[in-house]
Amino acid sequence: SVPGPMGPSGPRGLPGPPGPGPQGFQGPPGEPGEPGSGPMGPRGPPGPPGKNGDDGEAGKPGRPGERGPPGPQGARGLPGTAGLPGMKGHRGFSGLDGAKGDAGPAGPKGEPGSPGENGAPGQMGPRGLPGERGRPGASGPAGARGNDGATGAAGPPGPTGPAGPPGFPGAVGAKGEAGPQGARGSEGPQGVRGEPGPPGPAGAAGPAGNPGADGQPGAKGANGAPGIAGAPGFPGARGPSGPQGPSGPPGPKGNSGEPGAPGKGDTGAKGEPGPTGIQGPPGPAGEEGKRGARGEPGPTGLPGPPGERGGPGSRGFPGADGAGPKGPAGERGSPGPAGPKGSPGEAGRPGEAGLPGAKGLTGSPGSPGPDGKTGPPGPAGQDGRPGPPGPPGARGQAGVMGFPGPKGAAGEPGKAGERGVPGPPGAVGPAGKDGEAGAQGPPGPAGPAGERGEQGPAGPGFQGLPGPAGPPGEADLGAPGPSGARGERGFPGERGVQGPPGPAGPRGPGLQGMPGERGAAGLPGPKGDRGDAGPKGADGAPGKDGVRGLTGPIGPPGPAGAPGDKGESGPSGPAGPTGARGAPGDRGEPGPPGPAGFAGPPGADGQPGAKGEPGDAGAKGDAGPPGPAGPTGPPGPIGNVGAPGPKGARGSAGPPGATGFPGAAGRVGPPGPSGNAGPPGPPGPVGKEGGKGPRGETGPAGRPGEVGPPGPPGPGEKGSPGADGPAGAPGTPGPQGISGQRGVVGLPGQRGERGFPGLPGPSGEPGKGPPGPMGPPGLAGPPGEGREGSPGAEGSPGRDGSPGPKGDRGETGPSGPPGAPGAPGAPGPVGPAGKSGDRGETGPAGPAGPAGPAGARGPAGPQGPRGDKGETGEQGDRGIKGHRGFSGLQGPAGPPGSPGEQGPSGASGPAGPRGPPGSAGSPGKDGLNGLPGPIGPPGPRGRTGDAGPVGPPGPPGPPGPPGPP
């Protein structure tokens, strides 16, 4: 079956039933759940000091506890009795290299070594910086004035100066006579899709919600064993797409096809969902919801990252080994009073990784969290192809009478249909499956235009398919609608990526564990004291040829040297390569005004540029600084005065058009002959000292300087310590030491009496140090032995909570069956004739009527006399939106109108796309020389030039005086 044309948009439905009712009362407390496996709860308040219990039976040895922070260094103990000599221990591991000690005092200077071989000549260094600019020489004698040259041809016209400020708006002209209605122009091609606009600013945070009532605390679950490391988390949810770009201009209107026959096929299967549209701009931040009830404790988290390696603790003195027999362990005493809060110790080194424990029990699901904020509405998806109409469904139940919706746009009046004979009611068939979308039929030929029929009664039509998206309407903010029904609970989301470890919780009320095992070797000790000066070393062998040193940086410019004698001229060197163009210099002070030039002839008109496609509206650029005023161009030739035409009607201000591409540049005229140089202008005023320029880039490394003169004899100043040399080869192991004598075994000391427990000290002030790194998770303690508590009494119903935030919009429910046609309403009274309304929005394209015969073109009427200027009438009220009229026939072209008065300057339109680069302009006139710049700093002293070639022998000198006899 051929699908029919897309129907117009159906009327807006009545609003649905009101949302959910007020919040209900709090239900009775639930049954105690299974023990969870969540993290340890917060530390409770300290209990009253208990009494010392009797010694209990020997308990099982507990798990080794974590290594505690190093305690403070104790007082030095008394020397113990000499012990027996111990056995030779195993050789310990090599300790870490200690910190580099300070350099010792320099030993006596050794004998100078033999001179090394001369190194290879170094490469030529980079080109030096240009020297300072020389002082201006003395002015030469003025030359004789040359003959005046011939007058040069007029140069090309100068560039157009900047547009002047907008003039004052002129007086409102009289309303002109309405001209003949022009033919409707063809719609332009569809524009390219615009780029997404910049993201909007973040909305302000909403007010804080009222805190909710605390929920009933759950039963404390047993701590599970540390779980094994979980599998890598699923990838996170895809981030939101960028903001939706501006809609492009509407495309060309297509030909309407002939109405297809009603399809009677089976309903096809549901089509594939359309592509996801671009996400709209983020909406304003919603109000912060109230605090939800406390959820059930979650499963035990994965172990956090290992903490930073702590610094070395102070080494304590070894205590004497106890030799008493192990007594029976006492009964577990009641916990004593909480002691004073100790100062935080240094972070310990991370312990060895424990074995993976068994997987903990899965925690009970948490209570549903508060409703999330309403997300921004997504963009409208692409319209699907219309499927064949399905069979009519059963009659639905009467809905709740809703509020009257807004007045819909007036539809095209339909042709009165003939009333048919009512048939017998048919049996309601089963709902068919959704059929597959049929292929779009070819557009049919345009039929003849039909006559406009009378408006018929509203027919029992079904809701049409959604029409194409119309142009954006005016922003009339309607009243907020009622809160929608709370959506169904969504499916559980994918498991998120593991978040960063949270801050360390408060210290739990557990008992102190057993002392830990001895840790690994400590970090290297502190830097040692400076050693004594060593003996004088032997004279070293002559050193090898050193590696050529790196080119040193360019030194600071030296003082200006005295002018040297003029050297002999050497031979001319070859011409060097053309240097790169230097950076543009600072703008010089404006020179004296030159003589006025001759007015150039008007340039040839350029070819009109091709009409560019409307560009996308670009973001409004920042206002640039005002440019300098351009020179005023010569006045152009006065054009011929045109015949005055009749004054046209004042049109309404249209939207600013898109900036088109610039037209093709005109031909560049030939440059005129160079004129004679004018007389030098008077010297300008002394320029002001410019501001400090930005720091220049680091220049290339300079050439190595010449070898300086030898220094004075004797020992030089003490040099700075050299860099660390490479690590030497490991030394051979030293000789084995002699075993010491075995000492006498000391007598075991008496066991001291147990002291009384001290009173709890006052709580110390909280420390102000930075929080230490998070330590590794501790081993799970044994489960506590407690009786199951009896359920508490039923609480009284709580107060009604504050209304929660607006819930997310629920999913669109299935389309209900079409309602039965309503009874035809009584015709309303004839209303007064409405005023001429604004032009209505473009409605959906209706089926093309049969083309009517072309009417004969009427004769052109005589030109009427120009009417008097009428008085300006008062501005009328805004009219009611009228129906869109039919396109009129194209009238004859009117006589050319007189140029209208210049209207007020409109708002600057959005910046269009950047045009192609223009052609190179004609060379400008030679500018006047600016004032000489300030004398730069003296450059580095130049090196002596190479000696020139030996000159020819001079003529013989005159004979000398005779010698003495």
Swiss-Prot record:
Gene Ontology CC, one term: extracellular region
Region entry Disordered, spans: 1-965
Extent of Basic and acidic residues compositional bias: 52-66, 866-880
Biased segments, Low complexity type: 102-118, 136-154, 202-241, 359-385, 394-413, 472-482, 569-583, 596-623, 652-668, 697-706, 718-730, 851-865, 899-932
Residues where 5-hydroxylysine is found: K88, K253, K326, K536, K647, K806, K869, K881
PANTHER family: COLLAGEN ALPHA-1(XXIII) CHAIN-LIKE ISOFORM X2, SI:CH211-266K2.1
Subunit structure: Trimers of one alpha 2(I) and two alpha 1(I) chains.
Family in the record: Belongs to the fibrillar collagen family.
The name this protein goes by in its record: Collagen alpha-1(I) chain
Organism: Scelidotherium sp. (strain SLP-2019)
